[in-house]
Every structure is written in structure tokens, then in C-alpha cells.
């Protein structure tokens, strides 16, 4: 006798995401449950989420990992898909997930390839694709590390499967949005580096972390990993990614000097 279809919850966090949310929620409207943990949006985020039948909860922001764990704890379905407000499931990925959950999945957690949009171009080279994310797992099988910055990955100790179709990341439509994110994220990472004593106070550490490392990352990703095949947008992305690395170590160094 075939096993019954597994139910699916969508776990999301949000803050002023009215521009992204309709597109994202439309791609998961078919899920059994949508949970959105909001940290104090001033726009129509809550109204939009509820129009898609989402359960919305306010929780003061305490870090990305902490906030996402709150969302995971509120999910009640057999399986959970952790989704950012600017990510969209392609039709092919939706069908792949539905097919997977219609039977008994072989693994308890699955990687999903993510395709990133940068200034209107889909980035397919330079180490940015396939940008695999561990997002689909049995309820309770994974949690995010807390206090490790904005890019915490769900922690899961067992074998993991891989899905084949893309999740689309509508990341940075404008330079202003990109710079705002990178400024905020680099400050968050810098505070963590400072707490760990990695604030580059010695001259060799400073030169490596703030100068040589960003340069090496650019050369490796842009040339050796073929980032140049993504055109001008790829060049801008890899320059800015190296600048982001520079920023986080400069900010950590400044914190170590008591100047930030």
C-alpha cells in the first residue's frame, strides 16, 4: 500500500518585503502551510502574507539564525521548506518537490540549486552557480546555528539528497539595494569576527585579510572559475564581492581599535 502524501510547510522570515512577497508566495501557494515570522514591517508585508493564507507571527529580530528557528518551530507539517522572501520556486522545482513528497523520500534533507539574479542577469559562473542550499527537510530534522551572521546554514548530520531544478533568487535589482545589504551584512560579520578575536590587529593578518584575500578571491572566481562569462554584470559582481570581503575585515579591525 503506497504511503500517504507528505504535508509541507513553508518557513519564512520577513521585514518590509512587500516588493518580493507576492512573487515568492505565489510559487508556494500549493503548500499545506505557510509560516511568516515578521520582525516589524512598516509596509504591506503582513497584509500580503495573510492574503496568501499565511500564518503571520511577530518576533523581534535577534539574528537571522534565531529568527528562522522561530519559524521552523511554528511549522506543523511532515516536511519543511525554508525560503527567503526574495526566492521563488520554478514550476519544475514545484513539481519535483510534489513528486518527492508523494512517496517516501529516500533522505531526510535535500539540497536545492539556487540561481541568482544580479542587476537583471542570471549568474551561472564564478562559483555562484549552482548555489546549493539545504532548505528542504523533515520537520525537526535540522536547525540553524545562531549567532553566526546572516548566512547561517541549517545543521543536519545525516546523508542528504539533491534536487535538480532551480530555486530563483531575485537578489539585487539595484546597486543601492546591493550596497545596503552588503553594508549591513559586513557589519554583522565584523562583529562576529571581533568577538572571535579575528580582528586583524597584527600587520600580517591585516594585509592578508583586508588586502590579499579579497584580491585572491577575485582572481580565483573571475578568471579560474569563469566568472567573466557572465559579462559586465559578472565583473561588477566579483569586484563588489571582493569589496565586501574587504569591508568586513576593515570593520572588524576598526572594532578592535574601539573606533566602530
Question: Positions of the model-derived regions?
Answer:
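Short, structured coil segments at secondary-structure junctions
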Residues: 30, 52-53, 132, 156
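Acidic helix N-cap motif at the loop->helix transition within catalytic regions
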Residues: 22, 43-52, 92-93
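Cell-envelope/extracellular polymer assembly enzymes that use nucleotide-activated donors
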Residues: 7-9
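A conserved acidic beta->alpha catalytic loop
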Residues: 27, 38-47, 84
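Short aromatic/hydrophobic "clamp" motif used to bind/position activated sugar donors
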Residues: 80
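Conserved donor nucleotide-binding strand/loop of the catalytic core
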Residues: 46-74
Amino acid at each position: 500500500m503506497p504511503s500517504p502524501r507528505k504535508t509541507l510547510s513553508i518557513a519564512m522570515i520577513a521585514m518590509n518585503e512587500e516588493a518580493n512577497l507576492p512573487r515568492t508566495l505565489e510559487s508556494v501557494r500549493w503548500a499545506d502551510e505557510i509560516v511568516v515570522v515578521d520582525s516589524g514591517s512598516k509596509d504591506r508585508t503582513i497584509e500580503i502574507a495573510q492574503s496568501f493564507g499565511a500564518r503571520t507571527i511577530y518576533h523581534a529580530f535577534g539574528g537571522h539564525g534565531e529568527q528562522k528557528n522561530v519559524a521552523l518551530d511554528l511549522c506543523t507539517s511532515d516536511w519543511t521548506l525554508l525560503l527567503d522572501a526574495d526566492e521563488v520556486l520554478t514550476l519544475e522545482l514545484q513539481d519535483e518537490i510534489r513528486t518527492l513528497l508523494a512517496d517516501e523520500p529516500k533522505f531526510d534533507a535535500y539540497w536545492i540549486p539556487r540561481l541568482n539574479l544580479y542587476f537583471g542577469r542570471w549568474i551561472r559562473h564564478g562559483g555562484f552557480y549552482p548555489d546549493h542550499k539545504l532548505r528542504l527537510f523533515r520537520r525537526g530534522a535540522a536547525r540553524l546555528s545562531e549567532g553566526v551572521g546572516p548566512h547561517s546554514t541549517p545543521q543536519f548530520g545525516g546523508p542528504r539528497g539533491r534536487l535538480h531544478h532551480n530555486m530563483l533568487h531575485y537578489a539585487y535589482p539595484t546597486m543601492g539595494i546591493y550596497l545596503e545589504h552588503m553594508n549591513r551584512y559586513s557589519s554583522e560579520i565584523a562583529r562576529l569576527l571581533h568577538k572571535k578575536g579575528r580582528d586583524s590587529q597584527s600587520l600580517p593578518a591585516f594585509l592578508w585579510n583586508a588586502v590579499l584575500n579579497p584580491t585572491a578571491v577575485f582572481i580565483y572566481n573571475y578568471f579560474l572559475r569563469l566568472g567573466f562569462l557572465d559579462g559586465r554584470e559578472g565583473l561588477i559582481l566579483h569586484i563588489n564581492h571582493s569589496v565586501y570581503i574587504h569591508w568586513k575585515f576593515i570593520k572588524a579591525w576598526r572594532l578592535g581599535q574601539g573606533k566602530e
